[in-house]
């Protein structure tokens, strides 16, 4: 049997699409929009990224993917043919709403600069090619910039409400009081505290307590920051454990002390930073992890209309309400698919409730509704769920991460009671109010895309450290028992810092 010519096959395919009520959407390459931090040489990130909005020939933004195989392509190369550098450029991430996320990871610095071509077929998109004049530093270049210039380059927000709230309890920080109190109160054998000093942009630390292996996560983000920006001198304590530690009242005696944690709670005074989970995923994106704040955006499963109309949950048994979820699922399988994937806290329940198979996180988004229930503290999957395009049903919780304050119930997610007594009712509501549910899911996703951009996490870390340093009542010191945390060795990618240095004519 003779094969049909390719051109005829394409015509037939288009005819079928039109017949099915899905006319081809034509993309205008010159009218499409390209923007984002990855188009600026001075924005140094582990993975650089930028966005593309597909626009049609009439100037209208596309709100769904163009029909057929995505024809967008990105080519990143050195401006100088003499500079051969390793740059990993994966396929664009299709976010299924007419926008695309472009990523590239540099393994070496380019001195002369980069040329970034964004193509639709063979046609340049928007203002492509984009020229990034060098030097363009890779992640492991130790070339810290002036803080004001660095924040301006990253377009850091001038205010972060959660940071302002956290530091309202601490108009001044008494380092001497902390040196006396923290080891006694939190540094016992069961402790998980690391005492840091940053001096002259070098990181020093000593561990307090037995469970401090997670210092690798606080180390790596602090080192990444010091490679990019000049940090203020400061001395502080990081809590590596799950639970916030400082429960003293603001006006109480003795007064609370500012412990830095990855999770806050309504009854504690800890200063909150982005969790180790999203921070590590940002640092290791396109390398050591598969689920990260960028990759999730191109792996959100079927379109809304094709998702399974049930609420979904998979997770460990780290809170009793999760067991309740499984029981509800057994009784109401038409509304809820919930399973425990690993038993540790309630091992006696495994026989009764059963054990669910592990699922890839991207497969969660085959379902329209995602149930977010606390683990030991706030569930660290929540930012990833919000970046998907399912509706998130979030359990009321005393725990929070750094970005929760910006989210509103019924605008960005649907709240459910702590005891889950209204969960089934909320799932039924979502099924009966599909357009409203879809709208809330989209609003939540858009807000999460903004709040959880990797460069925003760097801004947040810097601003917490800056606010802390401003409040210190005495000079930080490298204390007995502290050791220097060295920068990782990267002999394959040596770089010289020469951005913004005065030329000979200016001297």
Curated annotation (Swiss-Prot):
> Do you know which InterPro entries this protein is assigned to?
CAP10, Filamin/ABP280_repeat-like, Filamin/ABP280_rpt, Ig-like_fold, Ig_E-set, O-Glucosyltr/Glycosyltrsf_90
Q: Does the keyword Signal apply?
A: yes
Annotated protein name in UniProt: Protein O-glucosyltransferase 3
Output the Gene Ontology cellular-component terms.
endomembrane system; endoplasmic reticulum lumen
Its family? Answer: Belongs to the KDELC family.
Q: Which GO terms describe its biological process?
A: protein O-linked glycosylation via serine
What is the species of this protein?
Answer: Homo sapiens
Location of motif Prevents secretion from ER in this chain is: 504-507
Question: MF terms per GO, please?
Answer: EGF-domain serine glucosyltransferase activity; EGF-domain serine xylosyltransferase activity; glucosyltransferase activity; UDP-glucosyltransferase activity; UDP-xylosyltransferase activity
Give the first-level EC class, as a single word: transferase
Signal peptide as annotated in the record: 1-20
Glycosylation, residue list: 61, 306
Annotated compartments = Endoplasmic reticulum lumen
Q: Which SMART domains match?
A: CAP10 (SM00672), IG_FLMN (SM00557)
Q: Provide the reaction this enzyme catalyses.
A: L-seryl-[EGF-like domain protein] + UDP-alpha-D-glucose = 3-O-(beta-D-glucosyl)-L-seryl-[EGF-like domain protein] + UDP + H(+); L-seryl-[EGF-like domain protein] + UDP-alpha-D-xylose = 3-O-(beta-D-xylosyl)-L-seryl-[EGF-like domain protein] + UDP + H(+)
The pathway this protein participates in, as annotated, is: Protein modification; protein glycosylation
Determine if NAD is one of this entry's keywords. Answer: no
Q: What is its EC number?
A: 2.4.1.-, 2.4.2.-
Entry-linked SUPFAM superfamilies: E set domains
Q: Which ranges does the UniProt record give for the Filamin repeats?
A: 24-134
Keywords per UniProt: Endoplasmic reticulum, Glycoprotein, Glycosyltransferase, Signal, Transferase
Q: What does this protein do?
A: Protein glucosyltransferase that catalyzes the transfer of glucose from UDP-glucose to a serine residue within the consensus sequence peptide C-X-N-T-X-G-S-F-X-C. Can also catalyze the transfer of xylose from UDP-xylose but less efficiently. Specifically targets extracellular EGF repeats of proteins such as NOTCH1, NOTCH3, FBN1, FBN2 and LTBP1. May regulate the transport of NOTCH1 and NOTCH3 to the plasma membrane and thereby the Notch signaling pathway.
């Amino acid at each position: 049997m003779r094969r049909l010519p390719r051109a005829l096959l394409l015509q037939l395919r288009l005819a079928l699409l039109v017949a099915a009520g899905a006319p081809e959407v034509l993309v205008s390459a010159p009218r499409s929009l390209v923007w984002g931090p990855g188009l600026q040489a001075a924005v140094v990130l582990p993975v650089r990224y930028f966005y593309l909005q597909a626009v049609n020939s009439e100037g209208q933004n596309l709100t769904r993917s163009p029909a057929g195989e995505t024809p967008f392509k990105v080519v990143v190369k050195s401006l100088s043919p003499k500079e051969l550098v390793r740059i990993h450029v994966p396929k664009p991430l299709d976010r299924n709403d007419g926008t695309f996320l472009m990523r590239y990871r540099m393994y070496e610095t380019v001195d002369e600069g980069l040329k970034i071509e964004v193509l639709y077929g063979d046609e340049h998109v928007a203002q492509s090619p984009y020229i990034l004049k060098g030097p363009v530093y890779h992640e492991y270049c130790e070339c810290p910039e002036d803080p004001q210039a660095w924040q301006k380059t990253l377009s850091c927000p001038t205010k972060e409400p959660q940071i302002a709230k956290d530091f309202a309890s601490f108009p001044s920080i008494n380092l001497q009081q902390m040196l006396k109190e923290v080891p006694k109160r939190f540094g016992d054998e069961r402790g998980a505290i690391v005492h840091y000093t940053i001096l002259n942009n070098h990181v020093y630390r000593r561990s307090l307590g037995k469970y401090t292996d997670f210092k690798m996560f606080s180390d790596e983000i602090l080192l990444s920051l010091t490679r990019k920006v000049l940090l203020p001198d400061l001395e502080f304590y990081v809590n590596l454990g799950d639970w916030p530690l400082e429960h003293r009242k603001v006006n109480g005696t003795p007064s609370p002390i500012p412990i830095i944690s990855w999770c806050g709670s309504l009854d504690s005074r800890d200063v909150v930073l982005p969790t180790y989970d999203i921070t590590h995923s940002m640092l290791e994106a396109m390398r050591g992890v598969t689920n990260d704040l960028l990759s999730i955006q191109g792996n959100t499963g079927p379109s809304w209309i094709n998702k399974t109309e049930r609420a979904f949950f998979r997770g460990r048994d780290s809170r009793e309400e999760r067991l309740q979820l499984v029981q509800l699922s057994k009784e109401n399988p038409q509304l809820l698919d919930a399973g425990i994937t690993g038993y540790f806290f309630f091992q006696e329940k495994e026989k009764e409730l059963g054990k669910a198979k592990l699922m890839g996180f991207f497969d969660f988004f085959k379902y329209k509704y995602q149930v977010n229930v606390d683990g030991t503290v706030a569930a660290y999957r929540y930012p990833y769920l919000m970046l998907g395009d399912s509706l998130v049903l979030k359990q009321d919780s005393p725990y929070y991460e750094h970005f929760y304050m910006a989210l509103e119930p019924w605008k960005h997610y649907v709240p459910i009671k702590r005891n889950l007594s209204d969960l089934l009712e909320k799932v039924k509501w979502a099924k009966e109010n599909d357009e409203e549910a879809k709208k809330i899911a989209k609003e939540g996703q858009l807000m999460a895309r903004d709040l959880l951009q990797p460069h925003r996490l760097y801004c947040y870390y810097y601003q917490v450290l800056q606010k802390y340093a401003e409040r210190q009542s005495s000079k930080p010191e490298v204390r007995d028992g502290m050791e220097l945390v060295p920068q990782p060795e990267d002999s394959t990618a040596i770089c010289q810092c020469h951005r913004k240095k005065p030329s000979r004519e200016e001297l």
